[in-house]
Amino acid sequence: MKSAVMAVACAAAPGFRGPSAFNGAALTTSAKACSAMKMSFESEIGAQAPLGFWDPLGLLADADQERFERLRYVEVKHGRIAMLAIAGHLTQQNTRLPGMLSNSANLSFADMPNGVAALSKIPPAGLAQIFAFIGFLELAVMKNVEGSFPGDFTLGGNPFGASWDAMSEETQASKRAIELNNGRAAQMGILALMVHEELNNKPYVINDLVGASYTFN
């Protein structure tokens, strides 16, 4: 599990990319493509201070609007999942539900470790239920509203739908930008928690920096 977490960390970090061979002509062509790409997408929500338009991996090279919106859809979804993961990580560190997680395995909620270690404790049937539920949400529930912005999963009967529609376009754009930034921070945050858990079983670095003791698993 440790090697898997580290592999994900390395793959996600631009600094771990190996060098590639190129010549002057290729570099010039790449620079022109990047310049055109920046002009196309620099006004999109999320291209904001302090980094502005930032695409170090070149995922949008020669991309059209459809490609951009697909990547934005994926980014928004991953950001939301990461925010839930951060909230769950912190909640489980301090709170355990009463009762049994699995009677057949004689496993209570209080017995479950936090973080990555929990994956090895969940019974196979439990993991199957989790993945089945995720698949159900992905295929049948969380679908983007056709013709709307990437990440608009508004469903019929949503109690917040009316309040969102009542907002001005400027306020909606601001809310979407805030969500993007929070999601980006959460993706880096949950990855950091996973890596530090595997390194020394001390994921909460801020606690260590300020001298606030805690027991993890």
Curated annotation (Swiss-Prot):
Its main location: plastid. InterPro entries: Chloro_AB-bd_pln (IPR001344), Chloroa_b-bind (IPR022796). The chain crosses the membrane at residues 81-101, 122-142, 183-203. It is a multi-pass membrane protein. GO terms for cellular component: chloroplast thylakoid membrane; light-harvesting complex; photosystem II. The keyword Plastid applies. GO terms for biological process: photosynthesis, light harvesting. Induction: Levels are increased twofold when transferred from high intensity to low intensity blue or white light. Keywords: Chlorophyll, Chloroplast, Chromophore, Light-harvesting polypeptide, Membrane, Photosynthesis, Photosystem II, Plastid, Thylakoid, Transit peptide, Transmembrane, Transmembrane helix. It is found in: Plastid, Chloroplast thylakoid membrane. GO terms for molecular function: chlorophyll binding. Residues 1-39 form a transit peptide. It comes from the Eukaryota. The light-harvesting complex (LHC) functions as a light receptor, it captures and delivers excitation energy to photosystems with which it is closely associated. Energy is transferred from the carotenoid and chlorophyll C (or B) to chlorophyll A and the photosynthetic reaction centers where it is used to synthesize ATP and reducing power. The LHC complex of chromophytic algae is composed of fucoxanthin, chlorophyll A and C bound non-covalently by fucoxanthin chlorophyll proteins (FCPs). The ratio of pigments in this LHC is; fucoxanthin: chlorophyll C: chlorophyll A; (0.6-1): (0.1-0.3): (1). Belongs to the fucoxanthin chlorophyll protein family. This is Fucoxanthin-chlorophyll a-c binding protein B, chloroplastic. It comes from Macrocystis pyrifera.
